[in-house]
């Protein structure tokens, strides 16, 4: 099984291009099922979850063409949904990726029926699907859970309605939003997720002919239309990848510019990096972080839905706190079981104490390389970051987690001066 070996001690310097957002491209690919003509998606990242989604669309009968493109143009995917013949998303594909649940709303709205296996993916807590089910029921769907499958039917078109999410759910908002686009009448979604990826999905749907207002706010209003046509959409840059490279630069005392970025989607993260002592300069599509000659200061943070601090950056900031000056307190409010990286960081010499959903991190002068194991996507990134500043070699196992969400991370870090390689 492939591993990544990181030799610590090199400050990162240079420029890196940010890929398209994992958490935007997956729902957007699923949204192509709503159309009655081909849809082209560009700025698509090379990720395992994208491959899985393409397999799922193909399994449903869609014709999918991948254009690897060029370094400047990027990768694009053309989906022709006119050949869709199946409305069942099987366990074999869904079990490896939770985002597969996002075909539920589009299939139901377009074809009046859908069967989707209960999802798998990262092992970081329960992540219930009840918000998806309740939201679709509010649009008139009949839904049951039988033999591990969510089975949904509509009697004719879905009917517009009002739904208040019990809790903020990104994928729940996306699923119900996609279904509402083809529903009859007006749908109002309250307590909707405000993440930039939700807004990007809405922008894609609007480009195909949907009528949506309020995406990026807690209240989204959808005027249902009878059909969506074809079109093109470019996926927004990945704010979590952006944040990960900025933390890497801060931890190593380097200076890095990330390009093809969207600084306005990262306010909470940039505020914490500034608090840690970094000098940050932004343009419309780039961020430069300078930490040369400085040790980061410990920062305390609490994860919460956007625009607050993202749970997907929690593990990376824990790694930063491991070598920072002072004590940082991290409160995780989004997912349970999201401190699984703590035991691995302890193997590198970190000083971390966990009390329930809170981790207290005391910065150490240095970490020491050791064999460690990735437990989920963002945890794997935190172990690479820790390896960048640890003495000697850090060998990270189970890096298939990493390939679900980061495109060529070892090549990008290597180009910035890191000593990092993938081994068979």
UniProtKB/Swiss-Prot annotation:
**Compartments where located:** Cytoplasm
What does UniProt give as GO cellular component? cytoplasm
What is the role of the protein in this entry?
Cell wall formation. Adds enolpyruvyl to UDP-N-acetylglucosamine.
UniProt lists the family membership as follows: Belongs to the EPSP synthase family. MurA subfamily.
In-chain residues carrying the UniProt-annotated modification 2-(S-cysteinyl)pyruvic acid O-phosphothioketal: 122
Q: Where does UDP-N-acetyl-alpha-D-glucosamine bind?
A: 98, 127-131, 312, 334
Q: Does the keyword Nucleotidyltransferase apply?
A: no
Task: Keywords in alphabetical order, please.
Answer: Cell cycle, Cell division, Cell shape, Cell wall biogenesis/degradation, Cytoplasm, Peptidoglycan synthesis, Pyruvate, Transferase
Reaction catalysed?
phosphoenolpyruvate + UDP-N-acetyl-alpha-D-glucosamine = UDP-N-acetyl-3-O-(1-carboxyvinyl)-alpha-D-glucosamine + phosphate
Q: Does the keyword Cell division apply?
A: yes
Show the active-site residues: 122
Q: What EC number(s) has UniProt assigned to this enzyme?
A: 2.5.1.7
This chain's protein is named UDP-N-acetylglucosamine 1-carboxyvinyltransferase
Q: Name one GO molecular function term.
A: UDP-N-acetylglucosamine 1-carboxyvinyltransferase activity
Which pathway does this chain act in?
Answer: Cell wall biogenesis; peptidoglycan biosynthesis
